[in-house]
UniProtKB/Swiss-Prot annotation:
Entry EC no(s): 2.7.7.-
Residues forming the catalytic site: 95, 97, 280
Record family assignment: Belongs to the eukaryotic-type primase small subunit family.
Enzyme class, broadest EC rank: transferase
Cofactors: Mg(2+); Mn(2+)
Transmembrane parts of this sequence: none
Source organism: Cenarchaeum symbiosum (strain A)
One Gene Ontology molecular-function label: metal ion binding
InterPro entries on file: DNA_primase_S, DNA_primase_ssu_euk/arc, DNA_primase_ssu_PriS
Name assigned to this protein: DNA primase small subunit PriS
HAMAP family reported in the protein's UniProt record: DNA_primase_sml_arc
GO (cellular component) term, any one: DNA-directed RNA polymerase complex
Length: 372
């Protein structure tokens, strides 16, 4: 990224933090959490202690970071190296990202940028430079966000029905790019280690299910072994998915018994991504991870990580677009349309345009424009 692009982003982000610091709540037990930040065009700074609002404001004003992070972990000494922090517990957080869903619309809003000349293209090779190194870029998509919302709802239903997690103890945040962070409140899960969190991640993803747990023995099964249609949890969900309503399940159960153990196991594997919540298990199991600070801007987009009060109506292109709207001159190379802040932009073919600062920041973050 060119120096003028870094300056544009640093100015835009700093202005946001100066004018809207009230949007960034200081986490509970902040002094026991590790903070960190990413510099524009620079490296990561970690192992910081922030005691309160004044120190957080100072960090943002002095450094104008591209990204700000805070640990889910609680430590005795958060400012020390990891081996000396003395971990106590950690918040339980799930990550759902639209790019991991494999939706068919993905190809329609993803393209490539040549690493040599910086031009955007949708083919296998750059029209100017030919085949070579490239970056893959995607922009906001209503269908992708909708798909991620469905996974959030699926996760929340599993947590509520199977584990007794009330909706009032769950906060869903838009990540600032293309996904959601689901924060689970309370103390029920905070003491879990990585192994236990891994088991929980497998559970909500419906990974590792075996036929015997659902009535299908290695040596066959009887009809009574599938009499769990009224049960809660995975048994009830699986029964409804495999066999349908009780009034019409007889034929499906007979067919499953005839097909046997191996076929039933294959069906379990196939149905796993349909019934389970598509979360990133590595995020859930990492008890030392630092997460994007709520209210802060995402350096990959210029959009904010904000809570979704009404998930169904939430529109990231509008609700999370919080940078100022004064006009900025950029040279844009964006081969598709983009809706942001209630306005439409593009397509652009290497042309000079005047756009609101929030759009300029988004396009520069994505590598779709350069400051004029």
């Amino acid at each position: 990224m060119h120096e003028k692009d870094l300056l544009l982003l640093a100015e835009s982000f700093k202005r946001y933090y100066f004018e809207h610091f009230e949007r960034i709540p200081v986490p509970d037990r902040a002094a026991q959490r590790e903070f960190g930040y990413q510099r524009f065009g620079g490296g990561m700074v970690r192992h910081m202690r922030v005691k309160g609002s004044d120190e957080l404001r100072l960090l943002l004003m002095q450094n104008s970071p591209s990204d700000v992070y805070c640990s889910n972990g609680i430590y005795s000494f958060p400012e020390l190296p990891m081996s000396d922090k003395d971990w106590k517990e950690a918040d339980l957080i799930f990550d759902i990202d639209a790019k991991d869903l494999g939706l068919p619309c993905r190809k329609d809003h993803t393209f490539r940028r040549c690493s040599s000349c910086g031009r955007s293209h949708s083919g296998d090779g750059c029209p100017r430079c030919g085949p070579g190194a490239h970056d893959q870029i995607s922009v906001l998509c209503k269908d992708c966000i909708g798909g991620a919302k469905k996974e959030v709802e699926k996760l929340m239903h599993i947590l509520e029905e199977d584990l007794g997690v009330g909706r009032d103890s769950v906060v869903v945040y838009f990540s600032g790019n293309e996904g959601f962070h689901v924060h689970i409140g309370g103390t029920q899960f905070q003491g879990l280690g990585s192994r236990e969190r891994g088991e929980l991640a497998d559970y909500v993803r419906f990974v590792g299910a075996v036929p015997q747990a659902f009535g299908m023995g290695r040596n066959g099964a009887a009809r009574r072994d599938f009499d769990y249609d009224d049960e809660g949890g995975w048994k009830g969900r699986l029964h409804r998915e495999f066999f349908g309503p009780k009034s019409r399940s007889s034929v499906a159960i007979t067919a499953a018994i005839k097909e046997g153990h191996r076929a039933f196991g294959e069906r379990l594997k196939q149905i796993s991504p349909v019934l389970g919540a598509n979360i990133d298990p590595h995020v859930t199991t990492d008890i030392h991870r630092i997460f994007r600070l709520p209210g802060s801007l995402n350096g990959k987009s210029g959009l904010a990580k904000i809570p979704c009060i009404n998930l169904d109506k939430f529109d990231p292109g509008s609700d999370a677009c919080l940078i100022d709207s004064d006009e900025v001159q950029v040279t844009a190379d964006m081969p598709m349309r983009l809706k942001l802040g209630g306005r439409r932009f593009g397509p652009y073919n290497g042309e000079a345009v005047s756009v609101p600062r929030f759009a300029a920041a988004y396009m520069v973050c994505k590598g779709l424009a350069s400051a004029a």
